[in-house]
């Protein structure tokens, strides 16, 4: 039985597979062109280049800074100087108990790093604000007693 388009219908009521499939007209391998040329050889005299060493800057600096925050009690300072391979400096800070810790240091190639620590008692301890702790009230609810 054929439908209105000329396809053969089977008992299942579906359409039949096409009778033929189209195949490519021709297969071809890729075309490779062979190019033959003489190698390009060039001879040149060696290039002489003078290498100039970059000048190394002599390391020399000095700095210092300080912080004095009376609200938080953060009080400190530092200073340092470098001349070639020798570094000298110091820093100090106020400890929570009001004392001052001072560190003096020096570093060089011959002796390495050396530090001396001094502690100076404070004239008065730094007041630290007390921590306020508030506890929430405990909620207690008793369940009714159940009788059987």
From Swiss-Prot:
Native organism: Locusta migratoria (Migratory locust)
Any one GO CC term of this protein is:
extracellular matrix
Task: Name the chain's protein.
Answer: Cuticle protein 8
Job description of the protein: Component of the cuticle of migratory locust which contains more than 100 different structural proteins.
Asked if Thylakoid is a keyword of the record, the answer is no
Tell whether Repeat is among the UniProt keywords: yes
Please give the record's comment on domains: The tetrapeptide (A-A-P-[AV]) repeats found throughout the protein are also present in many proteins constituting the protective envelope of other species.
Recite the lineage of the species.
Eukaryota, Metazoa, Ecdysozoa, Arthropoda, Hexapoda
Where, in residue numbers, are the sequence repeats?
16-19, 22, 28-31, 37-40, 44-47
């Amino acid at each position: 039985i054929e439908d209105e388009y000329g396809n053969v219908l089977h008992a299942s009521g579906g359409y039949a597979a096409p009778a033929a499939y189209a195949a490519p007209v021709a297969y071809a391998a890729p075309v490779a062109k062979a190019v033959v040329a003489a190698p390009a050889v060039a001879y040149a005299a060696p290039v002489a280049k003078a290498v100039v060493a970059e000048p190394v800057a002599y390391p020399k600096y000095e700095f210092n800074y300080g912080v004095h925050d009376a609200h938080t009690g953060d009080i400190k300072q530092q200073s340092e100087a470098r001349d070639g391979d020798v570094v000298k400096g110091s820093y100090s800070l106020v400890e929570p108990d009001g004392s001052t810790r001072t560190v003096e240091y020096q570093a060089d190639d011959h002796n390495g790093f050396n530090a001396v620590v001094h502690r100076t008692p404070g004239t008065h301890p730094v007041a630290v604000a007390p921590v306020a702790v508030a506890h929430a009230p405990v909620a207690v609810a008793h369940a009714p007693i159940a009788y059987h």
